[in-house]
UniProtKB/Swiss-Prot annotation:
The encoding gene: Slco6c1
Bilayer topology annotation: Multi-pass membrane protein
Organism domain of life: Eukaryota
UniProt keyword Transmembrane present: yes
Cystine residue pairs: 491-521, 497-517, 506-538
Cytoplasmic side: 1-94, 152-159, 242-253, 325-374, 433-445, 590-604, 676-706
Extracellular-side segments: 119-130, 181-218, 278-301, 397-410, 467-565, 625-652
Lineage of source species: Eukaryota, Metazoa, Chordata, Craniata, Vertebrata
Site location (Reactive bond): 499-500
Organism: Mus musculus (Mouse)
Official protein name in the record: Solute carrier organic anion transporter family member 6C1
Principal location: membrane
Transmembrane segments: 95-118, 131-151, 160-180, 219-241, 254-277, 302-324, 375-396, 411-432, 446-466, 566-589, 605-624, 653-675
GO molecular function, one term: organic anion transmembrane transporter activity
Amino acid sequence: MAHVRNKKSDDKKAMVVAKEDTNKSESEGVTKLQTYLKTIPIAKKKFAKLPKRKKSPTSAELLLIDPRYSASKEGPLGLGPIVLPFVQRFNNIDGFMTLYVAAVLIHGALFAVVDMTLNIYQVQFSLTRTEWYLMDFSDYIASFVVAIIIAHFGSKGNRTRWIAASCILMGLESMLFAFPFFTYEIIIPGRQSIELCMEENEKRNIICGNSVPNRSKCIYFHIAGQCIHGIAGMPIYILGITFIFDHIPTSSCGFYLAIGHSAYLIGYLLGMVGGLQNFQPPPKEKTVEIEPAKVYQLLQSGWWKTFLIIAAISFCVSFMMVCFPTSLPGAHKLRLAKRKEPPTIDRRLKDMKIQPHLKGFLHNIWHILKNPLMLTQAICKVSEYLTFNTSLYFLPHHLQTQFLITPGIASLLTGAFVLPGGIIGHFLGGLIVDRLEMTNKNKLKFTLVTTVVSVGLFLLIFFVECQTTTFAGINEDYDGYGQLGNLTADCNEYCDCTTSLYTSICGRDEKEYFSPCFAGCKATKVSQTEKTYYNCSCIKEGLAASDDEGQFIDAIAGTCDSDCLKLPLFFAFYFSATVFSNMCSIPVISIILQSVPANFTSLSLGVTYAIVKFVASVPAPLLFRLSSAIACIYWDNNRCGGKERCWIYNKNILVYEFMGIWMSSQLIIVLLNIYAIQIHDVVVHGEITESKTTVKDVKEQKERKA
């Protein structure tokens, strides 16, 4: 019995131990299961029929569940299932920046080459104002239309694929621009670059308006290409910038943004250098080998080859760009680290999220526009654009009137100083912000200081001036045989000269003439690397020097020497002013990105670029056109009866217009940044409300004591 009892007790103990082991294993299993369930995203917990939390999520939770910042979006570098291990070293922000800079360079270079082809169309087709406006500004109009739409929908998906699509569009538009130069006759061969006073001038063929073959087709192709160009730029400058901002620490954003923005101007400069090569005349050996009717193909071959090269590079960049994932490795961790940084956004936007429906979308745009920090910096971006384009538009005219430089050289000098000044300004501004790790308020102060310095340097250039030379037909009446404001006089009336060719010459009488034809010159040759002119009927005074063959020289190519040595000083001041005026660009962009929540960055940039492109497409062209009309003294009236361009300006009026528009744009930046500095703490922290309450409490305490 005792043995049986002991056996039963042992069995009972064994059952208890087994039960305890079973409970222990079950508890461990539950513990493991609970630990495993905690790693499942919230979206998948619904399928486990777990109770839903009725409490509304906080802004931090909204940020974590946003699929754009989810760690699950971080993937390898590859094309779908094709993932190569040895290329994963490029799956970082530096690898993306390499391709991004290439895309921006292509966009800038294409913009420069298109501007040059527009000048060809203007000369060859005698464009009307409406045609010229549509061909020049249709890209801005297209950008204005699609900027906010691309910012809204592009931020929800894979932004690198949007940029890859932009590269494909740039390739397609390059082919559109190349097609007219490959197919149609645009550049008419045999046109004189320097016109002399000859009887043949009366017999030349004059083709006007729609009588030019394939004129309308070329214009339509150009406008279509410009529209695609404007659309292609928005994903690059909106989604690309936000992608960079999301994958770098806030303290380092200035350096990366500076590289991206400087690349656009570098691309434009490279496009100018490459496009100028196409203006060089082909060798005589090649022109002799082909038929005269096909000479235009040789003249135009450089242009369509340039466009096709750009298209090939664009397609290559798009193929590599599409391999990047939605988020680079480490993006989610970086986003969590940014949450711990001091607040910089408008406190009213703290818990907002983008609504999917139209009403909510418009409501979000309205709230962004109500953000004073974002709105002031968006207007600063507009003013920065006006400042830069004022330089590009007015500086060549100022150099022509003030320093008597020919239009071609004035345009080259403008590009040689303004574009590098903009590049250096963009890069220095971003580098200084990056190295000093400025807060938003300090960035506002930095923008204010650099703008004030640029205004001071700009004022100095107007103390640099030269004496105006005598110009026949403009401020001199051909020794009494002509009228002021009329280039035609008795001495050149029979020459039938055209004002479409502005090739100024300096006569031995120390007077400047619009062209050899208006000086009545009948012969020319190159003497000691200098073009000289002979038998000029309008030049009757002055000492005549002889050339190597004993013939008396009446005039030489170029403007008359005014003994003005102040041009280097002028460019020193102007280059410095350009650098300082562009140093505010990167701080402005970074403030726009940091003054809104992370899920609003693309939309805020979209609103900013929509404002900039609208001003660039409507008010700015009207302003520049009106100011040009007011200051113009002599227009180019073509043989078809239309005004094409202004050749000569009133010096004083042009200076006042140049100074007024440039300084007004900079002063707007100064005033807006002073205002933004004053309200920064209020917008971010809400200190005015607290201070008002404190003052009220102090008054109540004084009244109680009284």
